[in-house]
């Protein structure tokens, strides 16, 4: 994609020459646009092609690829400009205006032609042979905060790729991304720093050598356990789930039955058991001792083929428990597990404390009639929303576009019954993200219909319909969402959290850290 923007930053008064000089220093610092851009992709980030001062306006022509897109770039300029000139020249920024914005997507001519007559709210769509131009005009801060640009791009992409879409878009009766409920915090949220940036200097976490992993020290662990206790009391116990201890080392055959290997095979950690040949491992040890490095190639020869994965969904053992069993939907099952880590391989997507490869959550899984399964799903979501409101945490709930059991899958030929909405996702607002209104997903409430029932040969003894559902309360993300809105000052926290946490423990005493 390419982005071309004509816009203005509108100041509170005419920009005088001395002020202009300071602003130009900011404009010429391209590092502003390179934060978060992968190495080698710098040309994809926002670039200021021209600028001009005109009274109160700073007129900008900007272009970009897919990293720090132009509409994000113009917003990103506000903070460093104000830091440079606000107090020094007694000037403020009144608004950001985008006069014209062209987003260009490319596709095969045959696919482009299928979009003829497509209407997209708040923009125009212009088609060329291999190009789709999405044209916006007269956008202000309000439209940017409503995220209409990203929604329009997503809408066009969905239309463009309909024949290649994940099964989710075929199944779901409400458009994924639709917000079904939200809550605005009653207090003024003044904390606006990325909690990851403070967690390390404060000594609450320390980076672990593995990608997407952290060592959580005593204060963070205390907060984790407080949230775990509150979620169990305020959500899980109120619905009557029974705690079980689920295995976390999952045989590949289980993942095959779940169809997980079809949808997201690249998102798991695969486990290779070692061969039980001590003399061969002695060679490995000897070589390591002599070379003072790990002989990876030799180690590969000592491992069997992949046989397991580390649990990527946490609910896998539930379906295995009922594999080819006869059940009675008059006596439905409701289990929950909080016994250990869940593992997802995010690759380059792992960042900060909110998107990690190793995380904690309370996983609820249930089975019964379709009506029972839908009611339990609704209850798990309802109590999560009530908890957020009790803690005055700003959130919204939307229709999910990636239910884990459908993610990446294109078709289903087994005659599976699916719910009208496979997934709802509840997000806590992240105030430190300025370019768009972004939230961290803290609760994922899913209904699977007969997907797993068919895959594991589960039947009701009277041949009645059996459905399953699962809700994950992401403990790691609840904590990060909470810290993003409240910060690290204990005195600013809600009374419920303070009582659960008690006295915060001290960080480890280390001379060279944090």
From Swiss-Prot:
Major location (coarse): cytoplasm
InterPro entries (UniProt xref): aa-tRNA-synt_IIb, aa-tRNA-synth_II/BPL/LPL, Ser-tRNA-ligase_2_arc, SerS_tRNA-bd
Annotated positions binding L-serine: 313, 344, 361-363
Cofactor note: Binds 1 Zn(2+) ion per subunit. This ion is coordinated with 2 cysteines, 1 glutamate and a water molecule that dissociates from the zinc ion to allow the coordination of the amino group of the serine substrate, which is essential for catalysis.
Subcellular location: Cytoplasm
Names of the cofactor(s): Zn(2+)
Binding site for Zn(2+): 315, 363, 470
Keyword terms, alphabetized: Aminoacyl-tRNA synthetase, ATP-binding, Cytoplasm, Ligase, Metal-binding, Nucleotide-binding, Protein biosynthesis, Zinc
Catalytically driven reaction(s): tRNA(Ser) + L-serine + ATP = L-seryl-tRNA(Ser) + AMP + diphosphate + H(+); tRNA(Sec) + L-serine + ATP = L-seryl-tRNA(Sec) + AMP + diphosphate + H(+)
Pathway membership, UniProt: Aminoacyl-tRNA biosynthesis; selenocysteinyl-tRNA(Sec) biosynthesis; L-seryl-tRNA(Sec) from L-serine and tRNA(Sec): step 1/1
Organism superkingdom: Archaea
Keyword check for DNA repair: no
Keyword Zinc attached: yes
UniProt-listed Enzyme Commission number(s): 6.1.1.11
Subunit note: Homodimer.
Family recorded in the similarity comment: Belongs to the class-II aminoacyl-tRNA synthetase family. Type-2 seryl-tRNA synthetase subfamily.
Protein name, per record: Type-2 serine--tRNA ligase
Organism annotation: Methanococcus maripaludis (strain C5 / ATCC BAA-1333)
């Amino acid at each position: 994609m390419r982005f071309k923007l004509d816009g203005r930053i509108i100041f509170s008064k005419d920009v005088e020459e001395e002020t202009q000089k300071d602003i130009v220093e900011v404009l010429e610092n391209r590092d502003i646009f390179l934060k978060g851009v992968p190495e080698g992709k710098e040309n994809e980030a926002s670039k200021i092609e021209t600028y001009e001062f005109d009274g109160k306006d700073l007129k900008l022509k900007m272009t970009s690829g897919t990293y720090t897109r132009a509409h994000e770039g113009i917003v990103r300029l506000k903070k460093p400009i104000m830091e440079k000139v606000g107090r020094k020249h007694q000037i403020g920024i009144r608004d950001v205006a985008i006069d014209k914005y062209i987003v260009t997507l490319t596709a095969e001519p045959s696919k482009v032609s299928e979009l003829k007559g497509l209407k997209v709210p708040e923009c125009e769509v212009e088609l060329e042979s291999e190009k789709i131009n999405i044209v916006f005009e007269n956008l202000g801060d309000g439209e940017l905060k409503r995220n209409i640009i990203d929604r329009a791009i997503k809408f066009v992409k969905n239309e463009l790729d309909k024949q290649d879409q994940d099964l989710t878009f075929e199944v779901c009766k409400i458009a994924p991304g639709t917000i079904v409920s939200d809550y605005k915090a009653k207090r003024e949220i003044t904390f606006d720093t990325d909690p990851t940036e403070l967690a390390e200097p404060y000594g609450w976490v320390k980076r672990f050598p593995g990608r997407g992993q952290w060592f959580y020290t005593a204060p963070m662990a205390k907060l984790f356990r407080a949230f775990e206790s509150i979620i169990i009391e305020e959500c899980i116990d109120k619905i009557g789930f029974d705690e079980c201890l689920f295995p976390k080392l999952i045989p590949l055959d289980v993942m095959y039955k779940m169809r997980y290997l079809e949808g997201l095979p690249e998102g798991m950690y695969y486990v290779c058991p070692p061969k039980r040949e001590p003399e061969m491992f002695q060679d490995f040890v000897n070589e390591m001792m002599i070379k003072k490095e790990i002989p990876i190639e030799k180690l590969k020869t000592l491992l069997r083929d992949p046989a397991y994965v580390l649990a990527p969904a946490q609910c896998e053992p539930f379906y295995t428990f009922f594999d080819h069993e006869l059940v009675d939907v008059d006596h439905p099952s409701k289990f929950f597990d909080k016994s250990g880590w869940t593992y997802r391989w995010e690759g380059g997507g792992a960042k900060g404390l909110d998107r990690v490869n190793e995380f904690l959550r309370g996983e609820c899984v249930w089975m019964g009639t379709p009506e029972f399964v839908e009611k339990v799903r609704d209850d798990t979501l309802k109590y999560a929303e009530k908890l957020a409101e009790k803690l005055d945490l700003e959130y919204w709930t939307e229709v999910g576009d990636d239910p884990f059991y459908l993610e990446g899958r294109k078709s289903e030929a087994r005659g599976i019954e699916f719910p009208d909405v496979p997934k709802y996702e509840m997000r806590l607002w992240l105030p430190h993200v300025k370019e768009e209104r972004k939230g961290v997903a803290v609760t994922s409430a899913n209904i699977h219909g007969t997907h797993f029932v068919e895959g594991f040969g589960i039947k009701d003894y009277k041949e009645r319909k059996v459905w399953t559902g699962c809700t994950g309360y992401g403990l790691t993300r609840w904590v990060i969402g909470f810290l993003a809105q409240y910060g690290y000052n204990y005195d600013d926290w809600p009374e419920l959290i303070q009582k659960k946490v008690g006295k915060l423990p001290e960080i480890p005493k280390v001379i060279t850290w944090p």
